Amino acid sequence: GMMGIVSIPSIDVELPIYHYTTNEILEKGAGHLFGSSLPVGGKSTHSVITAHRGLPSAKMFTDLDELRNGDKFFIEVLGQKIAYKVDRIKTVKPEDTQDMKIIEGEDLVTLVTCTPYGQNTHRLLVRGHRVAYNAGDEVKEPTHRRIPWAHILCIMLGVFLAVDCYMLAVRLRRNKGR
């Protein structure tokens, strides 16, 4: 069943966390990697949370590669919210689990997804260490503004079409006047 929620405000993601990482579970949310620490926080813990990218039905961890060092994500378990600050972003081969080990005295969570998008030959690891929780941190800060190229292109196309129509109308009026 569901054990908690992972939320990543900077990329607008909030997913339920389920026990295990079966395909069935990853179709509906994030999975807790069996063998890693439970995502309840505490010294000398390292929880690994994994989710798919680019499912037709849901965004999941599609934009995980947009996270930067210093961004925060949150885990909510048993009514408690824990904040983590991203401190390492790394791409590894699927069998390389070195970066998922417990580090003595540390409280860590690593978010994992497949990469590169569509090929899935490697794993993107985004690690965070526990920091003090402030409710204000969960407000979505548009830190990584995506340039909406599609919108810009449509606006430019509209402007060009308007200018073109205007020029055509002017030419037609001139020709009528002769």
Map each language-model feature to its residues.
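Alpha-helical transmembrane segments
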Residues: 159-172
